[in-house]
């Protein structure tokens, strides 16, 4: 059984499960026994940088040298420091690393051949449609795929004999609002319209086309637009957007092919620059592709809307039920029941000791993990039901004992940037159709933090009560405890005809000792007497009555 680690950052609050499916399905097709450990982070969703740090802390959990290969996906990561940190970390390991869509020295690359594919788009616009003025409507300037598409843009202009000027390219994000901003800013600037806006992806293209319509322009009559990635919004938009397929389904399998060649010493272990289909459509002046069934699409939208409403209702019910849980075990059990009601084979929860004990002086880590400071708080799977493990090492050994291809997905448990543990989902296939697992995880995190604070308060109150009821010198119950606990208990027992007795022991000449030798000698005398009397009463029921 080969162990593969997949480190991937989600798109906003969504999990990118297509890489997992590609690896798991590819392992069957290639005849490989694979156990995939998927470390999923969602560090691009929150506006709270400390929360995002808590997400990315998960990347420090795995011992990467213990794997047979690592797959790295930072295509959604917007934090450059995090990307650079992970690249340095991965460059130091002694196992092969395959990087998805991001070329790094020393790593194998799997992804679209962005330069060649973007050049296909430009050549089509130049030769088939006679475009002479071009604008690159780009994504983030640091993003590798965006950079490659921009390189293709510049090389094509040079080959066409068109000089590059600063007003011929724009950089932003990969989202719809970036396209909205590009079109709005261009309109307000009063600059002449280009023949074509070449967008770095379909989100930008859709935002640009929609805003153009609001501003009174017609695409492709007034100018043409192209996209990239072949998202649904390209195929079903009006006008249908010219695009390039993304190869999502093939990337995971191609990564596995590289590993297989390395493991077996045969086959092609070189970078995989994937070819994809160029799909001309209405936004560039070509006819509709005719590939889409609009009625079925509308039907699926309606069904999807109903399903989303049901899911949102279910999550709201789950949130309510989680809020009613007053013990960690009950909380994780309810969470597990919900997750396993979908396509998921098991849930395991690991927490740090300070979380488990709800210590009021808890010092949670912000970097790194210590397996000796972790406990298994909950474990349940469809093979063996409820499970108990004495240590996290025992859980890890259990997970590695699988005899079939398995995926374990890890999610961070954290209070902002403070690490409190992690959740492991076994074969969470539901994520392919329901990638919004982050909403469920957020509900769990919220209740877990509140429950921790509640337990800390309870423990603190118990500690204060213990101090209040006990003598500071001897640790015995004091007069307050006698008045508030013992006497009421006697009254209850006497009402039940149970006889009770209090025995008082007096220390002879105690006052003289205090007066003659000082109170410190009197204190020592009391503690000495306690040594002789402690073993006598059953259940150690003694008290000091000064």
Model-derived features with residue positions:
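Bacterial carbohydrate/catabolite-sensing allosteric modules
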Residues: 1-317
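Conserved nucleotide-binding and Mg2+-coordinating catalytic segments in signaling enzymes
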Residues: 462-485, 505-521, 527
């Amino acid at each position: 059984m080969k162990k593969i680690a997949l480190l991937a950052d989600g798109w906003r609050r969504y999990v990118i499960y297509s890489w997992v499916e590609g690896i798991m399905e590819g392992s069957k097709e290639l005849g490989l026994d694979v156990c995939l450990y998927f470390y999923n982070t969602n560090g691009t969703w929150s506006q709270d940088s400390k929360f995002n740090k808590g997400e990315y802390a998960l990347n420090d959990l795995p011992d990467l040298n213990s794997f047979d290969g690592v797959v790295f996906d930072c295509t959604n990561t917007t934090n450059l420091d995090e990307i650079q940190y992970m690249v340095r970390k991965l460059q130091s390991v002694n196992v092969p690393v395959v990087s998805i869509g991001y070329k790094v020295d020393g790593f194998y690359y799997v992804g679209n051949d962005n330069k060649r594919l973007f050049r296909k788009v430009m050549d089509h616009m130049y030769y088939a449609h006679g475009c002479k003025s071009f604008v690159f409507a780009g994504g983030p300037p640091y993003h590798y795929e965006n950079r490659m598409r921009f390189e293709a843009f510049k090389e094509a202009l040079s080959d066409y004999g068109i000089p590059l000027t600063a007003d011929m390219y724009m950089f932003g994000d990969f989202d719809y609002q970036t396209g909205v901003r590009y079109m709005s800013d261009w309109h307000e600037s009063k600059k002449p319209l280009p023949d074509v806006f070449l967008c770095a992806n379909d989100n930008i293209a859709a935002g640009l086309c929609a805003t153009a319509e609001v501003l009174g322009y017609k695409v492709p009559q007034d100018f043409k637009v192209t996209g990239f990635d072949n998202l649904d919004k390209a195929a079903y938009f009006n006008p249908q957007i010219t695009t390039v397929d993304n190869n999502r389904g093939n990337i995971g399998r191609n990564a596995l092919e590289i590993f297989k060649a390395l493991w077996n010493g045969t086959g092609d272990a070189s970078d995989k620059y994937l070819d994809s289909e160029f799909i001309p459509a209405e936004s560039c002046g070509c006819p509709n592709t005719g590939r889409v069934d609009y009625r079925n699409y509308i039907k699926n939208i309606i069904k999807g809307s109903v399903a989303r409403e049901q899911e949102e209702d279910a999550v709201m019910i789950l949130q309510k039920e989680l809020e009613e849980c007053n013990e960690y075990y009950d909380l994780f059990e309810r969470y597990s029941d919900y997750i396993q009601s979908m396509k998921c084979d098991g849930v395991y929860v690991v927490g740090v000791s300070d979380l488990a004990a709800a210590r009021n002086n808890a010092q949670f880590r912000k970097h790194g993990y210590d397996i000796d400071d972790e406990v298994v708080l909950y474990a349940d799977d469809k093979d063996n039901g409820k499970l108990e493990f004495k240590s996290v090492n025992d859980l890890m050994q259990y997970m590695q004992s699988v005899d079939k291809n398995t995926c374990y997905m890890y999610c961070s448990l954290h209070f902002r940037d403070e690490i409190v543990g992690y959740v492991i989902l076994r074969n969470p296939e539901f994520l392919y159709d329901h990638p919004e697992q982050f909403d469920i995880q957020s509900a769990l995190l919220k209740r877990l933090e509140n429950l921790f604070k509640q337990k800390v308060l309870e423990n603190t109150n118990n500690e204060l009560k213990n101090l209040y009821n006990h003598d500071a010198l001897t640790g015995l119950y004091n007069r307050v405890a006698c008045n508030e606990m013992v006497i009421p208990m006697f009254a209850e027992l006497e009402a039940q005809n149970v006889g009770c007795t209090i025995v008082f022991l007096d220390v002879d000449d105690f006052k003289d000792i205090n007066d003659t030798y000082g109170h410190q000698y009197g204190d020592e005398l009391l503690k000495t007497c306690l040594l002789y009397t402690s073993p006598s009463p059953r259940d150690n029921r003694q008290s000091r009555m000064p």
